[in-house]
Amino acid sequence: MNEQALAQRTNRREMLKLSGMGMLAGVAANALTPAKAHAAAEAVDVVYASWIHGNSMEIEYPDRIASQRHIGYYFEIEGKPGLTNWFHFAIPTPVLVNDARLRIKKVMLRFTTASVDAFVRDVHVYDGEKRIAVFDEVYLSGDNWFAEFVLPDRPEVRWGLGISLGVGFGVEMMDHHMHFISAGCDFTLQEPEPVEV
């Protein structure tokens, strides 16, 4: 019986030694981790992300479109030359998470255009009927696999998020097709950074 108790104490003693070494190893590894990695870990403040497929997009002026086609992987639009239009995405929006009101960190778009003569000119963000962010004259064309628009004020969400795209189609003899894949938003609980005066 005494030998068994001695063996148990030894095992406990050995475990305590090893756990102490493990703690020291963890402290050493933490100290050797680059500061950039620590900053990146602290910067993760997205508590909810929501995306909607491009096939859900609405066209404000359908008569200004030469053709449109819903395909499994995107919504294909061909604009009439020399005209502008507005396309709208309604993002599924949680306004509260664990009794805390969410804030908008950034909105994102995924789309392509077939030429520089078909472009996204403006990006407007709405919470219900209130316009909360304006990114005018961005003129995006070509491959935009992940275009981000950060809202530095991080406004609270109350009524539902909408992203409206002002688009344009030039008059050049170029392809005026656009392919909208998806649109989304990152939500946070963090308030905006204080502005130094």
What are these regions (language model features)?
Residues 1-14, 25-28, 35-37:
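N-terminal secretory signal peptides
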Residues 30-57:
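C-terminal segment of N-terminal export signals and the immediately downstream linker at the start
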Residues 78-100:
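Short beta-strands within extracellular/lumenal beta-sheet-rich domains
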Residues 100-114:
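A short beta-strand element within beta-rich, extracytoplasmic domains
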Residues 117-129:
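Short, surface-exposed beta-strand/strand-loop-strand elements in extracellular ectodomains
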Residues 132-154:
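Extracellular carbohydrate recognition and processing domains
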Residues 153-174:
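Noncatalytic modules at the cell exterior or secretory-pathway interfaces
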Residues 168-197:
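Exposed low-complexity, polar/acidic, P/S/T/G-rich flexible segments that act as propeptides
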